[in-house]
Amino acid sequence: MIIFKSINKLNKEVNFKADIGFVPTMGALHQGHVSLIKKSQKKCKKTLVSIFVNPAQFNNKEDYKKYPKNIQKDLKLLKNLKVDYVLIPTVKDVYGNKSKKKFKISKSNKILCAKYRPGHFEGVLGVIDQFIKQLEINKIFLGEKDYQQYILIRDFLKKNSNVKTILCKTIRMKNGLAYSSRNKLLNQKSIKGSAWLVSKLKKLFIQLKKDLNNKFIINDFINKNKVFKIEYLELRNKNNLSKKISKKNVKIFIAFYVKGIRLIDNF
């Protein structure tokens, strides 16, 4: 495993003509990241993992400061997985001396997380733009848990590059809660409670697929679980996130707070 702290040095030493899969992360690695890496290793000759906590995608400075970091633990995990290349760039290395460019997203995309986290996805697309401009990657691997992010990056890359986007399924703990770096900020009681809510969400989705227009049970679910402060609970088309849904294309999306920590999920 070769570790690079400079994009320039990485480009000088790595032959990007080879089939290279890219797994962008913000560190605090977990089993969800492991699944992305293994998928890349299966599909590509070489795998590059980045660890970069992108300040441009945080609309809350405290959220940025609190984001869990353990670089040595992350590197140990990546070494055990036999990752080929790891990139740990600085903010200046990624963005240069320019201001962190933020892309505008359309009004139709300002839904779900984009509605409640202004500037977040603009920051995400900004850093992805920098990576694809500076790294000649072939494929990028993204997790299903961050589904809205996947859709936006997929559409952005289709318009602006030849990079192929690979969606990887959500990996869950034994209790059903999706692995997330933010889980590390929760105590066991909060994790158990979150897992309980997600299990109820899964059952709700089964009910809703029988009657997609039943708004009553959605409102009832929110009202009965006010302790979690549900930010949104919506049904969307999995192909484009529109509200034109059918039993074949529907997904359910949720964002909620537990002890001040924001979690998202979907089925």
Which residues make up each language-model segment?
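Nucleotidyltransferase catalytic core that binds NTPs
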Residues: 1-227, 236, 240, 260, ...
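A C-terminal functional module that forms or caps the active site or interfaces directly
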Residues: 232-267
